Structure formats: structure tokens, C-alpha cells
């Protein structure tokens, strides 16, 4: 039950971080203005939204990292529980099966009835009239 709550909080923090980062003004990049951040100076005062959004982004990032650590802890507990049950390690079960080498992978052509007239690899050019 607690793991599901942590997963939901983790997803909400991820979506919140993406939204906040898109809304913020970057140096030289005003992509946030298209999402309504252009009028934020009137809402948040003369400093604008930089400090407010930066603080909220930092808090969401900290909660995101904490939920990530929590999910790692839950994953570790599940793997330890599987080992205590007596299930073998999947890496031990997986064995390499050596492939038997083929005798000859190159197809054999039928032998020609008469040998080539020249000793070179290139056939003779036809005579011109």
C-alpha cells in the first residue's frame, strides 16, 4: 500500500517538475511566455516569478529524489524477500549454450566441365569486329 502511494507521489512530482521547468523564464529564451509566464511579474511582484518558481522547483526536485530513494528501497526489499523464499538467482539459471560449429557454411558450386583457358581471375574480353 505504501509503495503505491510513493509511486503516485513520484509521478506527480515528475509531472510537476516538467510543468514548472517549462513555465520558467530562461536566460535569452522566452519559451515560458507562451504558457502564461509573461504576465508573472504582475502576479508575483517586481522581482517576477524567478525566486518563487525556483524555490518550488527545488522543493519538488527534493521530493522527487526522496521518492526515488524510497522506490529503490522497496525494490531492494522485494529482491531480498525472493532470496529468503529460496528461489534461485536468475543469473545462475541462465547458462550459455555453446553452438556446435558448422562443418562448412560456404555452399559448394558444381565443378565446371572444362577449366578456364587463362590462368588469371578475369575472363577474356570478347573480340570486337
From Swiss-Prot:
Chain segments annotated as transmembrane: 5-25, 56-76
Keywords (A to Z) from UniProt: Cell inner membrane, Cell membrane, Membrane, Protein transport, Translocation, Transmembrane, Transmembrane helix, Transport
A single BP term in Gene Ontology: protein transport by the Sec complex
Localization (cell): Cell inner membrane
InterPro entries registered for this protein in UniProt: SecG (IPR004692)
Membrane-protein topology: Multi-pass membrane protein
Listed GO CC annotations: plasma membrane
Superkingdom field: Bacteria
MF GO annotations: protein-transporting ATPase activity
Region Disordered, annotated ranges: 93-129
NCBIfam families attached to this UniProt entry: secG (TIGR00810)
Family (UniProt): Belongs to the SecG family.
Function recorded in the entry: Involved in protein export. Participates in an early event of protein translocation.
Record-given protein name: Protein-export membrane protein SecG
Source organism: Pseudomonas aeruginosa (strain ATCC 15692 / DSM 22644 / CIP 104116 / JCM 14847 / LMG 12228 / 1C / PRS 101 / PAO1)
Amino acid at each position: 500500500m505504501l509503495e503505491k502511494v510513493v509511486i503516485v507521489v513520484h509521478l506527480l512530482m515528475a509531472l510537476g517538475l516538467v510543468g514548472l521547468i517549462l513555465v520558467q523564464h530562461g536566460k535569452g529564451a522566452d519559451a515560458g511566455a507562451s504558457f502564461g509566464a509573461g504576465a508573472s511579474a504582475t502576479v508575483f511582484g517586481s522581482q517576477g516569478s524567478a525566486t518563487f518558481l525556483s524555490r518550488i522547483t527545488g522543493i519538488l526536485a527534493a521530493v522527487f529524489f526522496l521518492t526515488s530513494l524510497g522506490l529503490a528501497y522497496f525494490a531492494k526489499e522485494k529482491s531480498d524477500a525472493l532470496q529468503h523464499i529460496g528461489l534461485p538467482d536468475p543469473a545462475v539459471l541462465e547458462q550459455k549454450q555453446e553452438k556446435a560449429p558448422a562443418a562448412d557454411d560456404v555452399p559448394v558450386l558444381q565443378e565446371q566441365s572444362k577449366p578456364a583457358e587463362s590462368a588469371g581471375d578475369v575472363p577474356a574480353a570478347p573480340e570486337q569486329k
